[in-house]
Amino acid sequence: MSMSSIFSRPRLVVKKVLARAQNEGDGAIVRRSIGRPELQNLDPFLMLDEFSVSQPAGFPDHPHRGFETVTYMLQGAFTHQDFAGHKGTIRTGDVQWMTAGRGIVHSEMPAGPGTQKGLQLWINLSSKDKMIEPRYQELLHQDIPKAEKDGVSVTILAGESMGKKSQVFTRTPTMYLDFTLKPGSEHHQPIPETWNAFLYIVEGEGAFGSSDSTTTPAHHCLVLGPGEGLSVWNKSSKPLRFVLIGGQPINEPVVQYGPFVMNTKSEIMQAYQDYQLGKNGFERSRQWYSK
């Protein structure tokens, strides 16, 4: 294991946030990192939740407008259905990339017994894309590119790593990489220099940014400063698993009211009114209830 970064300007950790458990939805437990008061958002990212849900809890019918949600199952299965008649179940290792655009009403509920776990990321849309038609990309685990070398394995949900590239279309340019490092291994991942980036530790502990940095355990979100890429070392005796997420900043005002994310307060008021009255993208919401 080398003790130095391959980057002349490695990205260092500039902020560390512990994602504490809280209640959300209907009886669900989430660990929120981005979206907490101390890390309100990290352009273009609005929220990251690590969720843990057992039946009958879940996320019953609720609306969205103005952003994308990316749901990545770590354990178990979730069934999603919406007011446009779309219904699907994602299982361990699967991803659902949902563009809410001008409006969606949907439910997300556990699809089986036991505890269902996953990550949900909210990605902002630029003003020109906020009112587009909703769309979905569902990625099955076996179809998601993966690579492995020198004790490091990666699943490439978006972006590229270790010579492999994801085919997922991201309206806001995004990378989303799921890494596992065996004990004693290291990895150096380039990140576009103009992008904001952070990582979330799912299990184990690692040294991030510089080899002499203090190791950080699971359920922490680490915001990375500017530079060419991230260097990480697993000096422990157990595997380290973390997701590395980066994106091109949108650099527009963010006004959020619950499940609506727009650029101005008046647009938020309009979204709330559209949802209440069932118009401008929410036409089907008044007659629809999930089964």
UniProtKB/Swiss-Prot annotation:
Where is it located? Answer: Nucleus
The UniProt keywords, alphabetically, are:
Nucleus
What top-level branch of life does the organism fall under?
A: Eukaryota
Question: A single Pfam family, by name?
Answer: Pirin
Q: Which GO terms describe its cellular component?
A: nucleus
Gene3D superfamilies given for it?
Jelly Rolls
Q: Which InterPro entries match?
A: Pirin (IPR012093), Pirin_C_dom (IPR008778), Pirin_N_dom (IPR003829), RmlC-like_jellyroll (IPR014710), RmlC_Cupin_sf (IPR011051)
Among SUPFAM superfamilies, the record links this protein to: RmlC-like cupins
Entry's transmembrane regions: none
Family membership = Belongs to the pirin family.
For this entry, the protein name equals Pirin-like protein
